[in-house]
């Protein structure tokens, strides 16, 4: 039933475009300019956005003209508020916002051909979907979902015409360890306030692809994890428990490394994506935890063997583990790469 309803509405939209006299429908062109993208928090699943939205429409009394239209009025402040109270204008909402949209500035431009341009600069915190399986590497799809707020789709259509970065410079508007990778716009979407799709509103999505910087992920996650694994293996292989004095160094060192892993994971909590699947950062933390815990337990057991059974039994087992444990660590790291990148 829902699919049939969507098909009928799509047909209505097409008919209204071919025969505007059939349906009293207003087409509103939408342009979005990104001014600043900041505080991309994968753990909280939000990011902050400062953007400029331009909505353009024509009144029923307007007529097409080949000549360039001239600005009749340019309204701001109190005069703009009074005009909007007595004038119909398209009201839009951001469907994936996580906080209230705060407007910095409003401008209404009216031209002599009946064209109206409403420009709004605003700040908003937007929800994101942290779908980035290869984190701390890879791309993240951020988007702004813009939909009509009061007029249903048979009365108002949002038509995305332009999507750009301010001044065309990604380095100037992106804050944090991310870079701009591309953008796309999706129109002809429907937004429903109810589950039965009885009320449908026109919706556009403005997507911008962000790439996580390699150096940030390498120095914050990959390098510390590999160093902890390496130190854990070195403690095992070069602190033989055949010498009683090494017991404190080896067991205490493994315990310190284990606590370091937990502290690192906790400190990066807001930056790590919370996904329903195993991403690369999760896999690497699991690997380093398994290796350090395994080496800690092995150290305790081998030390106990030396104390109770002596060198005859403990030393051969320790020598075998000096070879097996590094191979085990390499196998776990390879598995982590395979599960996330292949």
Residues covered by each model-derived region:
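Bacterial N-terminal signal peptides
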Residues: 8-17
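Bacterial Sec-dependent signal peptides at the C-terminal "C-region" and cleavage site
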Residues: 16-26
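Intrinsically disordered, low-complexity peripheral segments of secretory-pathway and membrane proteins
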Residues: 24-74, 270-273, 277-342
């Amino acid at each position: 039933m829902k699919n049939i309803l969507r098909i009928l509405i799509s047909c209505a939209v097409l008919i209204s475009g071919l025969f505007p006299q059939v349906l009293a429908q207003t087409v509103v062109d939408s342009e979005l300019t990104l001014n600043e993208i900041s505080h991309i928090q994968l753990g909280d699943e939000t990011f902050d956005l400062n953007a400029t939205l331009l909505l353009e429409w024509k009144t029923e009394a307007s007529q097409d003209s080949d000549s360039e239209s001239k600005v009749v009025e340019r309204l701001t402040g109190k005069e703009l508020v009074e005009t909007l109270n007595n004038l119909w204008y398209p009201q839009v909402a951001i469907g994936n916002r996580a906080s209230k949209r705060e407007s910095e500035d409003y401008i209404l431009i009216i031209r002599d051909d009946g064209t109206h341009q409403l420009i709004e600069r605003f700040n908003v915190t937007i929800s994101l979907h942290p779908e980035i399986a290869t984190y701390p590497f890879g791309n993240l799809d951020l988007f702004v979902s813009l939909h009509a707020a009061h007029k249903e789709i048979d009365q108002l259509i949002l038509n995305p015409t332009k999507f750009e970065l301010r001044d065309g410079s990604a380095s100037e508007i992106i804050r944090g360890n991310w870079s701009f990778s591309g953008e796309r716009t999706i129109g002809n979407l429907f937004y429903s306030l109810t589950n039965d799709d009885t009320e449908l509103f026109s919706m556009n999505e403005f997507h911008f692809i962000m790439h996580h910087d390699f150096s940030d992920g390498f120095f914050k996650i990959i390098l510390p994890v590999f160093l902890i694994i390496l130190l854990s293996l070195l403690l095992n292989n070069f602190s033989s428990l055949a010498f009683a004095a090494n017991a404190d160094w080896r067991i205490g060192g493994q315990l310190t490394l284990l606590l370091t892993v937990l502290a690192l994971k906790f400190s990066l909590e807001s930056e790590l994506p919370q996904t329903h699947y195993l991403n690369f950062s999760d896999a690497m933390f699991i690997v380093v935890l398994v290796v350090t815990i395994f080496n800690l337990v092995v150290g305790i057991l081998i030390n106990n063997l030396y104390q109770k059974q002596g060198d005859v039994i403990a030393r051969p087992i320790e020598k075998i583990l000096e070879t097996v444990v590094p191979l085990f660590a390499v196998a776990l790291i390879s598995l982590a790469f395979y599960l996330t990148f292949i």
